[in-house]
Amino acid sequence: MSQQYSRRGGGKAKRTQVDAEKKFKLDTLTELFPDWTNEDLIDLVHEFEDLETIIDKITTGAVTKWDEVKKPSKKDRQQKEPAGDVEHIHAGSAAAAFGASAQAQGAPASLQRSHHSAGHQNNAKPYQRQSKYSNSPRQGKQQHQRKEKVAKENLKPAGQPAKSTASSTSWAAMLSKKEDSKLQAPEQQLEEQPQAQSQAQQTEEPVAKESQTEKKVGPQPVAAPLHEEQDSKPKKMTWAAIASKPPKHAENASKKPQEILQNVQDLKKEINKIATEDTAVEHSETTVTHSEVGVNAQAEHESFPIEDGARSVGADDTYYAENVDATNEDAAATVNGNAPAASEEAAAQEDASNANANVPVSLPAEANHQASQQVSFGSEEKQQTPQQPSQQGGMHAGQHVVSQVPQSAQHSSQAAAQTSQQVASQAPQQQTPQQAYYQDTYTQQLPQQQAQAAQAQQYYMNQYQFPGYSYPGMFDSQSAYPVYNHQQFAVPQQGQPTAQSSQNSQQAQSQSQQQQQQQQQQQQQQQQQQQQQQQQQQQYGIPPGYVQAGELAAQSPASTHTQPQQQPQYGGYGMPYYFYQQSFPYAQPQYGMAGQYPYQVPKAAYNYYQPQQMSQAGNQATHQSQSSQNDDSSSASAANPQQGQQGGANSQQQSQAAAAQAQAAAQAQFQQYYQFQQQAAANQQGMPYGYSGYDYTSQTSRGFY
């Protein structure tokens, strides 16, 4: 006593701790095996301390749940009483055997202790509910079940469950039947409705046989209500039940492939006959509704999925080829001739016989599809007098449905075709003006682009020699060339600066020549400005036609979207380094391998629109110079003697022009050198490692050097 009291008093803290642990284990187990109840799991948790072993045993099937705790009906109880007596005797006398087997199993001490002290009431909570010898049905069952578990693991005659004694007492026989019983146990659950009707079921053997016969009889009209029940209320099935299904069917199905094929061929002939007879009737009777079809589907489980495009609906062939689906096999095994199985080629027949080998049970989920996608032809014998050949009725239903469905299918396909034609005719009309414009501009740009692409190729040539190396734009373009022919950076047109500088050198000639030259210069400056603007616009994606639009849009990169052919500027990465982090080895600015431009990116306040602002300043300067030139030229034509003044004006004007030129040249260079780097910085704004290029002072990139 003293020991017990001390255990009850001092062990309280420990016990709560243990309970918490067990609760945690229970939670995880219920998550993993949602179809196991707590009552099932509690005993496992007590029996094995390690969570992994429990999971292992459950998944391997070394441990099973209690049978369903459903209250048996009176008939069942009366049938099972003889067996039940044996069970209770067994459970009562089993204490010694159970203890021994538990030790042999190496079960933890807690289990043996619980068995030892089961009579006392001070045991841990779960055991207060189940004192060892209580006779209430559930606990008796549990007791018996626990023993059966042990028996399955170490097959000792002592721990044998009473079930086996009913059929054969030798444990060798039991061993050979172990697998059978594993397969049959889950099937018992599924077969419960049929079992309730059949009368002789004390032991498991009859159940197994009966389940086989049930399977064979299944699809015939007698068993129709059963199937309806199974479909209408989805049954909760254990994974074991699902997994162990196919073998039974495979047996049945392999017995009967020849019969099936004969049935199908007979059906074909009769279908041909009736199809010719009934074409007239058919059109008047296309009103069968889908709901009726659905009812037939459930009443008689023989469902044939429709293939819409298989045939056009003609006078004779209102039927069309159907693949015998996995779900059909039950039905096909016992086709009565009321269902038109429809014409199948020889290949389809072979398929059917092959498919018979592995037939899954059609689960309740499929019942939902039946109404919509599977037309099924039920047994129509209820509606007809038995003398009338059942063929006819089935055929009628079949034909209404068949004629109905393809017609609707045809309508929808026609409608779809019309709409697609309309869309197709509209689309080119919408696109043509834009396309024409862009094609024109691009054909104008082509020679220019090719020249630039060649230049860029040459410039980057050394980089193709290093096999593993890829420079930033390499995969951005869809053409073979890298991005440059899309004008993402503009190579300055050569030849303009040189021409103008030569003209500058000639400006010491007579004033009449000077005036002509000045006019030429004006034109050239205007051209140059336009070209620069075009370059910038192309570089930012504005088509070169919009000159003023450029200033309105402030040349922002967002206007890339006005030119569909251009690559998007920010998402520009090609696949190959989509996944690299955008840091030193793979990131942007390695343009010159040997470091031809030792530049650094300015810090965060960098202005991406600098070039545009410079060009605007240039515009203002040239406008001023133009206006002054106009005044000068008019005054010069009026009076020659004022040439001195005019010369002064000219010199001023020349200096202005020279400044504008210098600015333009500088700007072109700026574009060439810094455009890429600018783009790189912009590209990296969206990237995960936002290094702004090589800034050796910045905190972010310091680690890489």
UniProtKB/Swiss-Prot annotation:
Residues 119-140, 614-623 have a biased composition (Polar residues). It is found in: Cytoplasm; Nucleus; Chromosome, Telomere. InterPro entries: DEF1_CUE. Residues 1-20, 62-264, 277-438, 491-512, 614-656 are annotated as: Disordered. It comes from the Eukaryota. Its main location: cytoplasm. Residues 21-63 form the CUE domain. Residues 65-90, 206-217, 248-258, 299-310 have a biased composition (Basic and acidic residues). One of its GO terms (biological process) is DNA repair. GO terms for cellular component: chromosome, telomeric region; cytoplasm; nucleus. Ubiquitinated. Keywords: Chromosome, Cytoplasm, DNA damage, DNA repair, DNA-binding, Nucleus, Telomere, Ubl conjugation, Ubl conjugation pathway. One of its GO terms (molecular function) is DNA binding. Recruits the ubiquitination machinery to RNA polymerase II for polyubiquitination, removal and degradation, when the transcription-coupled repair (TCR) factor RAD26 fails to efficiently displace stalled RNA polymerase II. Also involved in telomere length regulation. Binds DNA. Homodimer; may form higher order oligomers. Interacts with the large RNA polymerase II subunit RPO21; the interaction is direct and serves to bridge RPO21 to the Elongin complex in a manner dependent on transcription stress. Interacts with RAD26. Belongs to the DEF1 family. This is RNA polymerase II degradation factor 1. It comes from Eremothecium gossypii (strain ATCC 10895 / CBS 109.51 / FGSC 9923 / NRRL Y-1056).
